[in-house]
Amino acid sequence: MGKTLAEKVWDAHVVRKGEGEGANAQPDLLFIDLHLIHEVTSPQAFEGLRLAGRPLRRVDLTIATEDHNTPTLDIDKPIADLTSRTQIETLRANCKEFGVRLHSLGDKEQGIVHVVGPQLGLTQPGMTVVCGDSHTSTHGAFGALAMGIGTSEVEHVMATQTLSLKPFKTMAINVEGTLRPGVTAKDIILAVIAKIGTGGGQGYVLEYRGSAIRALSMDARMTICNMSIEAGARAGMVAPDQTTYDYMQGRPHAPEGADWDAAVEYWNTLTTDADATFDVEVDLDADTLEPFVTWGTNPGQGVSLSAKVPSPEDFGDENAKAAAERALQYMGLEAGTPMKDIRVDTVFLGSCTNSRIEDLRVAADIIRGRAKDPNVRMLVVPGSARVRLEAEAEGLDKVFKEFGAEWRFAGCSMCLGMNPDQLEPGERCASTSNRNFEGRQGKGGRTHLVSPVVAAATAVRGTLSSPSDLEPAAAGALTGIAV
């Protein structure tokens, strides 16, 4: 019997096989190739090592960055919020004590951990990657088995470079066809989550497959894998191919010379075998997919942008009906309202889902030469200092500034509102982030998850919009990048 991609990577990392079978099976012990850390989930883990008198076992496989609490304005000044400042200072002290490489605020490689890892070439096919962060699944776009872990597991990896886990089930997400202009990777994953639900992937590793996935860039594949957790999955993966290798080659930590050739030879084996069997398969037609947007308070509460706000009566399940009623109340929406009639106050372009260079390029293409709706505030927050510098070298910052957007420094920013970038109560935001939970972007804030394409068009019109809703002269020179 053949193996899936996830099974191949798993089996290659088993240090000790758990005893027993089926429901009585004990966890396997897996070796971890890359451990990424940040300021929020690492302090207790470092303290655990300190109290036990243990060293950090593999400093060479551990890298830290500051992202969740970092300000995106005035980064040369002391952090005003005491909690945020304490977490940043604690990370710096811990990394210095234990010898961990840290990219601090102001460093040219600082940024969101799930942007920094890939851009440095640290994330590679066939790896096991962990981080104390839900959206570690981002790295699965490279054919890595990448998952978020809790603080106690962070300490375990620090101490042993291993993790005890039971094997997951496997689910294939088959996306065939060709995306239409203005439809992106973000729309694919929002449609997948709407289809299987926020718990549909629980206990599974998702493998994204099919012609539509193969046609995507690495930035776009990272967008899809990033939100696997929003479907309840532990991880999401895409098999590596030439697109992967073209992205990786020449990056600081990528193999070189003969090592590169040997690595690619191995990476080419990391595909699901023809005779492998998935536990579940889900199909999505890319040809018919439209821009997607959420209307409620979880990522599964989404519809096509051309649709209307659903009614609780549209849901047969009583729990889903009750959830819809609560979501509509919190979001201040009425059933039957066209999604395109919903006016927003803020547009946020950023987060580990959509803050890479292609995301910024496609948004800039749409707004170039246009005027922002005067009642809309737009924040553009690059995912890393490197992305920011690259965007500035291309003149994208000037496009955003001329449009009236705020051009910020790198960080998680308004995705989760742990720094000053927050919504006011009742404020409505079109956001390229990954979660639209109640209060996620600020107490009482209302979040609609969208693609960078929809975010840009929305900033122009002031209501949830796609580029096709703009006047021909306002559509910009779309690059065709599927982000």
From Swiss-Prot:
Binds 1 [4Fe-4S] cluster per subunit. Keywords: 4Fe-4S, Amino-acid biosynthesis, Branched-chain amino acid biosynthesis, Iron, Iron-sulfur, Leucine biosynthesis, Lyase, Metal-binding. GO terms for biological process: L-leucine biosynthetic process. PROSITE patterns: ACONITASE_1, ACONITASE_2. It catalyses: (2R,3S)-3-isopropylmalate = (2S)-2-isopropylmalate. InterPro entries: 3-IsopropMal_deHydase_lsu, Acnase/IPM_dHydase_lsu_aba_1/3, Acoase/IPM_deHydtase_lsu_aba, Aconitase_4Fe-4S_BS, Aconitase_4Fe-4S_dom, IPM_dehydratase_rel_enz, IPMI_cat. It is an enzyme of class 4 (lyase). Its EC number is 4.2.1.33. CDD domains: IPMI. Pathway: Amino-acid biosynthesis; L-leucine biosynthesis; L-leucine from 3-methyl-2-oxobutanoate: step 2/4. Its cofactor is [4Fe-4S] cluster. Gene3D superfamilies: Aconitase, domain 3. GO terms for molecular function: 3-isopropylmalate dehydratase activity; 4 iron, 4 sulfur cluster binding; metal ion binding. [4Fe-4S] cluster binds at residues 352, 412, 415. Heterodimer of LeuC and LeuD. Catalyzes the isomerization between 2-isopropylmalate and 3-isopropylmalate, via the formation of 2-isopropylmaleate. Belongs to the aconitase/IPM isomerase family. LeuC type 1 subfamily. This is 3-isopropylmalate dehydratase large subunit. The lineage of its organism: Bacteria, Bacillati, Actinomycetota, Actinomycetes, Micrococcales.
